[in-house]
UniProtKB/Swiss-Prot annotation:
Any Pfam family: ASC
GO biological process, one term: cellular response to aldosterone
UniProt lineage: Eukaryota, Metazoa, Chordata, Craniata, Vertebrata
Originating organism: Pan troglodytes (Chimpanzee)
Biased composition (Polar residues): 628-637
Listed transmembrane segments: 109-129, 586-606
Region of interest (Disordered), residue spans: 1-67, 627-692
Family (UniProt): Belongs to the amiloride-sensitive sodium channel (TC 1.A.6) family. SCNN1A subfamily.
Post-translational modification summary for this protein: Ubiquitinated. Can be ubiquitinated at multiple sites and undergo monoubiquitination and polyubiquitination. Ubiquitination by NEDD4 or NEDD4L inhibits the ENaC channel through endocytosis, intracellular retention and degradation of its individual subunits.
SS bonds (residue pairs): C156-C328, C252-C259, C305-C312, C417-C502, C439-C479, C439-C498, C443-C494, C452-C479, C452-C502, C454-C468
GO MF assignments: ligand-gated sodium channel activity; WW domain binding
Protein name (database record): Epithelial sodium channel subunit alpha
Length: 692
């Protein structure tokens, strides 16, 4: 009892290094020393007064240990990071880098194999991404069948019109041309060349840019004959017998400082182009509205018109004049209130026309063909007779079968096309929708106005701009032919600026020809045409022609572009490659991303630590000392348990002298804390007795 009381008195006073009462008993001390994680038997079965005297001590606050996991935790080294990654990742082959670490040869083999596999996979990734960003397209072809809107049909007389308003100028041009042909080729027709008071030389001198013969040096043996660089018209009629001369006319700039000859090796081409050049100048003097054109009627050119076995009327066509092709008529254009529909294919369910092919007002020096010219196009597209038309022969029935096709292109990154031309840097001068031909002609007209100061008469012009005439623009011919060369070589950039439309409707045509009318039927056919139209056919077969235009079938083909590699396809291909080389899933990719992130963080922390150790050392100032102090304060408390070296646990003795003891430890560390086995011992926070 006295020992108990002594112990109680010692508990009331400060006892920094006194053991618990149960540890003072001999036999029980050995049991506790042999099994430290278990409870002391003396405390469990001892005096009740001892238990009451000690009482339950309040639980001390838990201090964080190295084994506890923080909210944000990073590995201490690269080695630890890679070992953790290889042990826990789902990527195949990574575990072999750790399992075979006792065999360096296997470790090296698997490391090289893993890196090569990784490189091969990302090489395939590069190919897949390269294919995706090249934006390839696939062409999808669909066949559809439905009622079809009949396209617009434009047909021209191939007979340049002799305007009454410029009759005198045209007759003067014909006389000068006849004189030129006589001087150059000794040709005289005696029909257009009339006698006058002026001589031939004086008559030719009244017209600028006369046609003349030019001597050129003979080409070397075996060399290819080429046209002048300034010429823009191809030699359609090659010369049979080579001579050391060419035919052309001279063109100069405004101040006559630069001149060139527009030459041709064929005299036919030279005369036609020279006559055409002067004919354009005469046409430019015509007023905007001509009464002679307004009086023109369809019956002067077309004898009969039927569509789906029903006769046409005046509301089904519109009329315009072309400088080279004469009077033109467009059937079923956008101005027609009720567009024609084709519900059946075949020659009897289309457009049938009987045409007059005679050329009473023919200008022989401007056009050398006879018949008619026809073109099939969309309702909202202009008729470019030079680009898409073809000629009809007199005395022949021409049957033209059509097949409709549509093409839908992809724009943006997949193709260079435009939806409506609003993003094209060329103003549309035509009253129609955007097409590539519309843009090209508008671009040339803009360049013509900018460089030459006047507009070309074959294309529409903006307001307040005059058509070219050498009476007002003396050097426009020089400018025009120079511009033609730049246009053909795309120095003007028109072919680059004018992109293709994203949606195009075209008609594939195929023609068949037959003699019409036949020998046995031509008498009554011509008699009926003469009685019906009050017109006498003089040359019979050469004065008429017939054309049939119809759908071959109502099936039409739709060609549409679609992306060959979409985002879904790309992800699928990437997943296939990842599974092929590593047999992993999307979560494995997340693991790789986590590994890269941890590598960056560890590298950053190591650099930061090195920076602090170099520039924030304690000897460099107060800031370094504060850093060290904060580092010590943030470190976990050490479990320091000093004890005298001469203390014997088997024999009790007096308390050690305060001079031999260490500074008092943190009392919170003397409280119970969980043991590795999960139980709480009274002496778990103290060092084992008997140690050095």
């Amino acid at each position: 009892m006295s020992s108990i009381k002594g112990n109680k008195l010692e508990e009331q006073g400060p006892r920094p290094l006194q053991p618990t009462p149960g540890l003072m008993e001999g036999n029980k001390l050995e049991e506790q020393d042999s099994s430290p994680p278990q409870s002391t038997p003396g405390l469990m079965k001892g005096d009740k007064r001892e238990e009451q005297g000690l009482g339950p001590e309040p639980a001390a606050p838990q201090q964080p240990t190295a084994e506890e996991e923080a909210l944000i935790e990073f590995h201490r080294s690269y080695r630890e990071l890679f070992e953790f990654f290889c042990n826990n990742t789902t990527i195949h082959g990574a575990i072999r880098l750790v399992c075979s670490q006792h065999n360096r040869m296997k470790t090296a083999f698997w490391a090289v194999l893993w890196l090569c596999t990784f490189g091969m996979m990302y090489w395939q990734f590069g190919l897949l991404f390269g294919e995706y960003f090249s934006y390839p397209v696939s062409l999808n072809i669909n066949l559809n069948s439905d009622k079809l809107v009949f396209p617009a049909v434009t047909i021209c007389t191939l007979n340049p019109y002799r305007y009454p308003e410029i009759k005198e100028e045209l007759e003067e041009l014909d006389r000068i041309t006849e004189q030129t042909l006589f001087d150059l080729y000794k040709y005289s027709s005696f029909t257009t060349l009339v006698a006058g008071s002026r001589s031939r030389r004086d008559l030719r001198g009244t017209l600028p840019h006369p046609l003349q013969r030019l001597r050129v040096p003979p080409p070397p043996h075996g060399a290819r004959r080429a046209r002048s660089v300034a010429s823009s018209v191809r030699d359609n009629n090659p010369q049979v017998d080579w001579k050391d001369w060419k035919i052309g006319f001279q063109l100069c700039n405004q101040n006559k400082s630069d001149c060139f000859y527009q030459t041709y090796s064929s005299g036919v081409d030279a005369v036609r182009e020279w006559y055409r050049f002067h004919y354009i100048n005469i046409l430019s003097r015509l007023p905007e509205t001509l009464p002679s054109l307004e009086k023109d009627t369809l019956g002067n050119f077309i004898f009969a018109c039927r569509f789906n076995q029903v006769s046409c009327n005046q509301a089904n066509y519109s009329h315009f004049h072309h400088p080279m092709y004469g009077n033109c008529y467009t059937f079923n254009d956008k101005n027609n209130s009720n567009l024609w529909m084709s519900s059946m294919p075949g020659i009897n369910n289309g457009l049938s026309l009987m045409l007059r092919a005679e050329q009473n007002d023919f200008i022989p020096l401007l056009s050398t063909v006879t018949g008619a010219r026809v073109m099939v196009h969309g309702q909202d597209e202009p008729a470019f007779m030079d680009d898409g038309g073809f000629n009809l022969r007199p005395g022949v029935e021409t049957s033209i079968s059509m097949r409709k096709e549509t093409l839908d292109r992809l724009g943006g990154d997949y193709g260079d096309c435009t939806k409506n031309g609003s993003d094209v840097p060329v103003e549309n001068l035509y009253p129609s929708k955007y097409t590539q031909q519309v843009c090209i002609h508008s671009c040339f007209q803009e360049s013509m106005i900018k460089e030459c100061g006047c507009a070309y008469i074959f294309y529409p012009r903006p307001q307040n701009v005059e058509y070219c005439d050498y009476r007002k623009h003396s050097s426009w011919g020089y400018c025009y032919y120079k511009l033609q060369v730049d246009f053909s070589s795309d120095h003007l950039g028109c072919f680059t600026k004018c992109r293709k439309p994203c949606s195009v409707t075209s008609y594939q045509l195929s023609a068949g020809y037959s003699r019409w009318p036949s020998v046995t039927s031509q008498e009554w056919v011509f008699q009926m045409l003469s009685r019906q139209n009050n017109y006498t056919v003089n040359n019979k077969r050469n004065g008429v022609a017939k054309v049939n235009i119809f759908f071959k079938e109502l099936n039409y083909k739709t060609n549409s572009e679609s992306p060959s590699v979409t985002m879904v396809t790309l992800l699928s291909n990437l997943g296939s490659q990842w599974s092929l080389w590593f047999g992993s899933s999307v979560l494995s990719v997340v693991e790789m991303a986590e590994l890269i992130f941890d590598l960056l963080v560890i590298t950053f922390l190591m650099l930061l630590r090195r920076f602090r150790s170099r520039y924030w050392s304690p000897g460099r100032g107060g800031r370094g000392a504060q850093e060290v102090a904060s580092t010590l304060a943030s470190s976990p408390p050490s479990h320091f348990c000093p004890h005298p070296t001469s203390l014997s646990l088997s024999q009790p003795g007096p308390a050690p002298s305060p001079a031999l003891t260490a500074p008092p430890p943190a009392y919170a560390t003397l409280g119970p804390r969980p043991s590795p086995g999960g139980s709480t011992g009274a002496g778990s926070s103290a060092c084992p007795l008997g140690g050095p």
